[in-house]
Amino acid sequence: MVLHFSNLARHKTFVLHWYRYTLRNVARQTFSWHLKARVKDITRTTIVKHKSDKSSWSIYILLRDLKALNGFLRNKKTAAAWRLLTLYSKKPLRSGASSPSVALEHSPPLQDPETVRNSHIIHSYIVERQQKNLLPLEIPAEYKTLLLLPLALHDHALKRLHLIESKLVRGPPKVSVNYTSAGKARIWFLRTAVNKNQRQSKALGQIIRREKRKNQKNIDYWEKCRVNGIWAWHEAAWEHLMETNTMLTESPAKYFDNERSRKRAASDGTSVKAVAEWLDPVFSSLDMLQAQSAEQAAYFEQYKHNTVLQGLQQFFARKSDKMYQNRKKRFESLLENDLPFVTPYFSQQNLATVMKSHKF
């Protein structure tokens, strides 16, 4: 009999992947904290609400709209994303009503990301000045837009400029050797200003994930061998009881606390021989798993000394120094040629525009 899609593990995994993908997208692609909170809340609520929904058509529409929401977030279409969320946050639609994605075209437009960002900047600027008694509590909206917004953007850009200056004073960025553990193995890599975040090697991420999966399988196999070994010990104890009419006094944990305990007890008589006959295959499997783990650890340790410390570290150190020198030249050019002529109230000559022209 064919299972209903709601009982399939792959369906649950698919929905979970889309949910996590949505959370990553909204964290990276939008500046609005309100929109971030709305996406997280409405997406989670909708998924929980339809957890027991058995209608394949209903689930198809929900997944289609979730895909559309991610497309809006990736393309910075926050207005469309907001409208889609608004339709899902309303009361349930009557029968025969159009789906949320169809009704998007008739919804009013909302503010663009730049306007939302400027609103946050001017709000922080006004609150900070009011706390210092530099601005009145009541300010007309026209004054905020025409008078205070350019000053707020200038102040925001000036803070960024001071941050850039403080980083340049510290000198070229350092090249650090880091590692992540995958069982006994340590996977070594370089962390620099050149290859950070999205510029980090994708192959490195694939290697780390692959090794962690392999290590988890190794742990799972080890646990299975331990469980099978305990059952094997009980079989050996029964065999010993049938042959000698005596019970074994030790516990099965003795043989798994120390992997060589069976060798030390090899001359103790038939009881140890019976235990050895049952446990030797298990110990062979454990030895093989340990050898694989040690081999991987030795490989990555050798890779660290032969590759990471020998060639890659010097290569990235040179690239980091070159990047620092280019950044320093651009900063000095900004200070000498453009900074003296900065004016907050001219869009082509304000500090943010000047910094952008120098790639800051």
Swiss-Prot record:
GO terms for cellular component: mitochondrion. Residues 93-112 are annotated as: Disordered. Keywords: Mitochondrion. It is found in: Mitochondrion. Its main location: mitochondrion. Essential for respiratory growth and required for mitochondrial protein synthesis. Required for vacuolar acidification. Belongs to the RRG1 family. This is Required for respiratory growth protein 1, mitochondrial. It comes from Lachancea thermotolerans (strain ATCC 56472 / CBS 6340 / NRRL Y-8284).
